Design a protein with these regions (language model features):
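Metal-centered catalytic cores of metalloenzymes
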Residues: 19-81, 85-163
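Sec-dependent bacterial lipoprotein signal peptides
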Residues: 1-18
Length: 163
């Protein structure tokens, strides 16, 4: 995992040192790193009984958001993953970044991991980029992985800034 996380950080650093948003305002190029520990006990409004666990690393550099999500123990029928906005402790929040599942999820289910990158203003965002960055920076976001057995989410963890 450490080599993948390092590769993720290097990639994020190479993508852009200084960027500007759609309004021409320069966005600081300070690397920000957030992590989340994923488990069923973190699911809301009701915890999920599961042996599945995982972790996520999300980096922000300028207007570039990069993620790596790893499943640390087996999870069955993984179908989706997202960064959500916390609505309240007992309520699921809106999807802000969709990890775009597909063939990559079979790799995550065996512990390989899923990575991706999105730029502020990119059409793959589920919400405007500025609000997405704000909710991550303000500690109001979480990573959630969904399965066929638990379509509302099987493992979840709040993103916490570590750098």
């Amino acid at each position: 995992m450490h080599s993948r996380a390092l590769a993720l950080l290097v990639t994020a650093a190479l993508v852009g040192v200084a960027c500007s948003d759609d309004n021409g305002v320069t966005i600081p190029a300070e690397l920000e790193i957030y992590t989340a520990q994923l488990n069923g006990a973190n699911e809301a409004p009701t915890a999920v009984t599961t042996t599945a666990t995982g972790h996520a690393v999300v980096t922000i550099l300028g207007n570039i958001v990069t993620w790596q999500v790893d499943v640390d123990s087996p999870i069955d029928s993984l179908i989706a993953g997202h960064i959500h906005r916390h609505a309240a402790d007992s309520v699921a929040g809106n999807v802000r970044v969709d990890f775009k599942p597909g063939s990559a999820w079979s790799a995550a289910a065996t512990g390989q991991g899923v990575t991706g990158t999105v730029a502020l203003g990119d059409t793959t965002l589920a919400a405007p980029g500025d609000s997405m960055l704000a909710i991550i920076r303000e500690g109001r976001s979480y990573v959630n992985l969904h399965t066929r057995a638990n379509p509302g989410g099987e493992i979840r963890g709040t993103l916490v800034r570590v750098q």
